[in-house]
Amino acid sequence: MSYAQTRTQTKAGYKAGVQDYRLTYYTPDYTPKDTDILAAFRVTPQPGVPYEEAAAAVAAESSTGTWTTVWTDLLTDLDRYKGRCYDIEPVPGEDNQFIAYIAYPLDLFEEGSVTNLLTSLVGNVFGFKALKALRLEDLRIPVAYLKTFQGPPHGIQVERDKINKYGRPLLGCTIKPKLGLSAKNYGRAVYECLRGGLDFTKDDENINSQPFQRWRDRFLFVADAIHKAQAETGEVKGHYLNVTAGTCEEMMKRAAFAKELEMPIIMHDFLTGGFTANTSLAHYCRDNGLLLHIHRAMHAVIDRQKNHGIHFRVLSKCLRMSGGDHIHTGTVVGKLEGDKDITLGFIDLLRENYIEENRSRGIYFTQDWASMPGVMAVASGGIHVWHMPALVDIFGDDAVLQFGGGTLGHPWGNAPGATANRVALEACVQARNEGRNLMREGGDIIREACRWSPELAAACELWKEIKFEFEAVDTV
């Protein structure tokens, strides 16, 4: 067949030009399928752009559409593959914002790939000129897609069985200063914190392998500290060894060395490291019996602005699919951003198996995790012993309460700082189990415990005036 004949035949069923997105991608009569991936976008259109057109543009640009009609549309079934905006909902109190609900057929996404999922949903559309701002508020991941992911390497119950600790939150500490310590001094700080009563210590997010402390030296000194602390206390101890590196090959080499040293847990910066690297590491951890702690470094660049970016509840869901046993979630009461209701919403999305839609907590869709293991929430950032009652009340048992400055800043040193936190935690758990109200009686509970612990009394005196009372930027 000649070129001229081909050109004539395509003309018969094809009309070139630009048409409104809403003619194809706005389908208010559509009923989402159980297998659809559903997305809730907060859309701020440019002045003069109708809501239906802006919403349809998001559906088009995040699925099959482009700016003009193309004749190759005739070579596929667009009705099968296109994203569809099926509902629009105004945002209360905002004149020019609305929530666009979009359904995507499952065929658009590669199985087991968070990287491909996000590349489609948020990879290009956020730069679209017709929009002033765009934020992905929530996703509903269907069971059919979830079953293509391994998820967390182990999950909450398996972790507790590995470390033999039940009925209370776990205690951690980020070693400070985060940069500048030699490997030997770093190991010393780890040992002091663990023998003082903590369950875990932690590399900070930006400790990798710098001139003042190469990764192999740090791993060796930390391993010595853990083995010594375990022998002295009779408890399983751990340190989150950060294996994040410049290449996946180097990252896996560091993970393998941690396993060789019989370390129970390693760590990854999942956003700066990337989802492909994180998923690979999670698979390695399951195969080799390592727990995987996840740091969310860079998250606020993506999630803090209320009208643009990706909400952390979406990043949390993506992390649970990609794989991690812990992830930092904020504290509500500490120095980092976090509205209480929203924080509790995405903590449930990390830990629970089935979560009902609850708009007061920012949950737009009911999510069934199909028995995928849960992720333990990590409360970290500006917390100290006076926060302990609120933290136990807010987070419950399946969490790691991580006191960095709140341990290492103790006036008597690292080990007494760890002891102060352990005593405060044990006092709060006992009081809760006896039926006392931690939010109302928390101060009294801590003061009573000070009578039996000079380490706790010294910590309480030091931090009695320290508060972080700022209004949350991101609210429902």
UniProtKB/Swiss-Prot annotation:
Binding residues for substrate: 124, 174, 178, 296, 328, 380
Main location: other
EC number of this enzyme: 4.1.1.39
Keywords, sorted A to Z: Bacterial microcompartment, Calvin cycle, Carbon dioxide fixation, Carboxysome, Disulfide bond, Lyase, Magnesium, Metal-binding, Monooxygenase, Oxidoreductase, Photorespiration, Photosynthesis
Annotated active site: 176 (proton acceptor), 295 (proton acceptor)
Modification after translation (UniProt): The disulfide bond which can form in the large chain dimeric partners within the hexadecamer appears to be associated with oxidative stress and protein turnover.
Residue(s) at site: Transition state stabilizer: 335
Reactions it catalyzes: 2 (2R)-3-phosphoglycerate + 2 H(+) = D-ribulose 1,5-bisphosphate + CO2 + H2O; D-ribulose 1,5-bisphosphate + O2 = 2-phosphoglycolate + (2R)-3-phosphoglycerate + 2 H(+)
Cofactor: Mg(2+)
SUPFAM superfamilies: RuBisCo, C-terminal domain, RuBisCO, large subunit, small (N-terminal) domain
A GO CC term assigned to this protein in UniProt: carboxysome
GO terms for MF: magnesium ion binding; monooxygenase activity; ribulose-bisphosphate carboxylase activity
InterPro entries: RuBisCO (IPR033966), RuBisCo_large_chain_AS (IPR020878), RuBisCO_lsu_C (IPR000685), RuBisCO_lsu_C_sf (IPR036376), RuBisCO_lsu_fd_N (IPR017443), RuBisCO_lsu_N_sf (IPR036422), RuBisCO_lsuI (IPR020888)
Matches recorded under PANTHER family: RIBULOSE BISPHOSPHATE CARBOXYLASE (PTHR42704), RIBULOSE BISPHOSPHATE CARBOXYLASE LARGE CHAIN (PTHR42704:SF17)
Role according to the record: RuBisCO catalyzes two reactions: the carboxylation of D-ribulose 1,5-bisphosphate, the primary event in carbon dioxide fixation, as well as the oxidative fragmentation of the pentose substrate in the photorespiration process. Both reactions occur simultaneously and in competition at the same active site.
HAMAP family on file: RuBisCO_L_type1
Assembly and oligomerization: Heterohexadecamer of 8 large chains and 8 small chains; disulfide-linked. The disulfide link is formed within the large subunit homodimers.
Protein name: Ribulose bisphosphate carboxylase large chain
Originating organism: Cyanothece sp. (strain PCC 7425 / ATCC 29141)
Source organism phylogeny: Bacteria, Bacillati, Cyanobacteriota, Cyanophyceae, Gomontiellales
Recorded name of the encoding gene: cbbL
